[in-house]
C-alpha cells in the first residue's frame, strides 16, 4: 500500500513497565518490517503497576535500533519544563541519528498525573502551557539566541546548541480528542495529527468518514495544504489485512499504529503479533 507506514504502539505501564522488555520488542519490530515503535507517556497508572520512564526507554531503544522511527505518543508537555524538554529531544534526535518523532498532547488522568503532584489539572491551563511550551521548544531548536515572554513562561536570550539533526525540526505530531477542535487547530501548525475519537471504545475503530472529517477540519486550518502532513491512527489488526487499513488511507491516513498491550493478551501474544509484521506489505 504505497505511502502508508506502520508502527507498533506499546504501553509503558504494568507488564510493559519494564524497559528491557520494551527495548526487546522494539528490536523485534525493526527485524519484522515495521516502520516505527512508539510508547505511551504515563507518570502513574493503576495502583501497584510498574511504570517505565518513556524517554529514558526511547533513548535505550535508539541505541539498539537503526531504522525505525521512534518516540512517545503522546507526551503531556504541560507537566514538563519546555526548555528541558527541548534539550532532551535534541539529544534524542542526535542519539537516534534523526529518527525521532515528537508527540504532544493534553495528557490524560488529570488527577493521578497532574493534581496529585501539585500541577494544575484544568484543561484550559494545560492547553495554554502546551501552546507556550511549543513556542519555546521550537524557538530553542532554532540555533539562534531566543527570548520569550508569555503568561506562563519566560526565556531570556538563550542559545541552545546543537540543533536537532532533523531540520527545521523533528516532526511534531499533535494528539487530541475529536470532535474537540482546539487540539486540531494546534495540529494544523505542525507536522501531523493523532486523533482519538470520543465514543469509540478501546477495541473499536472510528469509521473512515469520522477520520476524514477530522482530517478535513485540520487541513482547512493549515496555511499550506500541500505541505507534508501526517495523519496517524491506532487500531488492531491480525496480521496482513490491507482491506482493514485501505479505507482509512483513502481518508488521509499516513501512519497506522498497531495498538498492543495487556488488553490484547499476554506479552507472548504481543511478541507474536509484532513478529507477524505490519498489516500491509
Q: Which residue stretches match the model-derived regions?
A:
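Active-site-adjacent structural elements that line small-molecule/cofactor binding pockets in enzymes
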Residues: 1-281
Amino acid at each position: 500500500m504505497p505511502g502508508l507506514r506502520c508502527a507498533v504502539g506499546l504501553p509503558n505501564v504494568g507488564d510493559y513497565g519494564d524497559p528491557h522488555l520494551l527495548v526487546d520488542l522494539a528490536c523485534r519490530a525493526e527485524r519484522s518490517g515495521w516502520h516505527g515503535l512508539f510508547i505511551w507517556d504515563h507518570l502513574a497508572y493503576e495502583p501497584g503497576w510498574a511504570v517505565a520512564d518513556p524517554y529514558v526507554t526511547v533513548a535505550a531503544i535508539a541505541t539498539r535500533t537503526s531504522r525505525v522511527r521512534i518516540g512517545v505518543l503522546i507526551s503531556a508537555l504541560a507537566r514538563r519544563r519546555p526548555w528541558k524538554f527541548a534539550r532532551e529531544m535534541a539529544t534524542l534526535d542526535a542519539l537516534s541519528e534523526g529518527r525521532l518523532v515528537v508527540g504532544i498532547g493534553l495528557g490524560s488522568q488529570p488527577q493521578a498525573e497532574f493534581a496529585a503532584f501539585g500541577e494544575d489539572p484544568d484543561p484550559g491551563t494545560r492547553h495554554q502551557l502546551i501552546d507556550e511550551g511549543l513556542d519555546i521548544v521550537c524557538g530553542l531548536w532554532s540555533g539562534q539566541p531566543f527570548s520569550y515572554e508569555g503568561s506562563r513562561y519566560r526565556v531570556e536570550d538563550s542559545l541552545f546548541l546543537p540543533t536537532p539533526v532533523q531540520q527545521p525540526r523533528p516532526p511534531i505530531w499533535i494528539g487530541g480528542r475529536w470532535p474537540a477542535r482546539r487540539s486540531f487547530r494546534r495540529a494544523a501548525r505542525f507536522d501531523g495529527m493523532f486523533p482519538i475519537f470520543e465514543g469509540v471504545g478501546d477495541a473499536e475503530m472510528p469509521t473512515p468518514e469520522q477520520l476524514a472529517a477530522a482530517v478535513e477540519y485540520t487541513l482547512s486550518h493549515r496555511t499550506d495544504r500541500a505541505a507534508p502532513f501526517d495523519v496517524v491512527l491506532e487500531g488492531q489488526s491480525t496480521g496482513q489485512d490491507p482491506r482493514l487499513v485501505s479505507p482509512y488511507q483513502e481518508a488521509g491516513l499516513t501512519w497506522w499504529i498497531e495498538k498492543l498491550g495487556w488488553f490484547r493478551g499476554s506479552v507472548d501474544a504481543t511478541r507474536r503479533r509484532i513478529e507477524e509484521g505490519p498489516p500491509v506489505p
